[in-house]
């Protein structure tokens, strides 16, 4: 089982860094913008250092701009614990091959089973399908995810774009074991009203004996 925190918000990182639940961080330019961070290599350098300082195993940073190859090289140069996120486009496939380190890449923005097969052919470490966006489209999401599971053996299917804990639990039931979880789901993920009620009863019983 592998969970990655899908957030560029430092408070989210700090919140779960000691839980033992999240092994790594994943980000993209949209998440940086929402966190009011500049999309730049200087920001990436800072995020890389902060992630390692909180004992995350790695951080995934996405290419941007007009020269993906140059940005990807700079991400790799941050250190051995950086992984390059590359959109699953024709240009992205060329980039994975040109970089020559598929084990340090993730194909992201995946919306079809064939992209999983491409990821497997390229030997990338992760392929990230966008579950909620597929659910909201007219595509057959269950067939797509079945195809991803069937085609990816070395490559890990890193399920992204979750809107709710219910979606997360549904995918767990289908056998998925590798997820990016957005910071917006942390409250629902880390607590359950019935558990909280049980704790109150336990504490009340203990207090009555004091």
Residue ranges and their predicted role:
Residues 4, 9-13, 19-21, 27-34, ...:
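Active-site beta->alpha loop and helix N-cap motifs at the rims of alpha/beta catalytic domains
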Residues 4-6, 59-66, 79-90, 103-117, ...:
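Catalytic beta/alpha-barrel core
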Residues 20-24, 77-82, 98-106, 121-128, ...:
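Glycine-enriched alpha-helix->loop->beta-strand junction motifs that scaffold or abut catalytic
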Residues 28, 84, 119, 171, ...:
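Conserved, mostly hydrophobic/aromatic
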Residues 36-46, 66-71, 85-101, 111-118, ...:
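Active-site-adjacent beta->alpha loops and helix N-cap segments on the catalytic face
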Residues 149-210:
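C-terminal alpha-helical cap/extension of soluble enzyme domains
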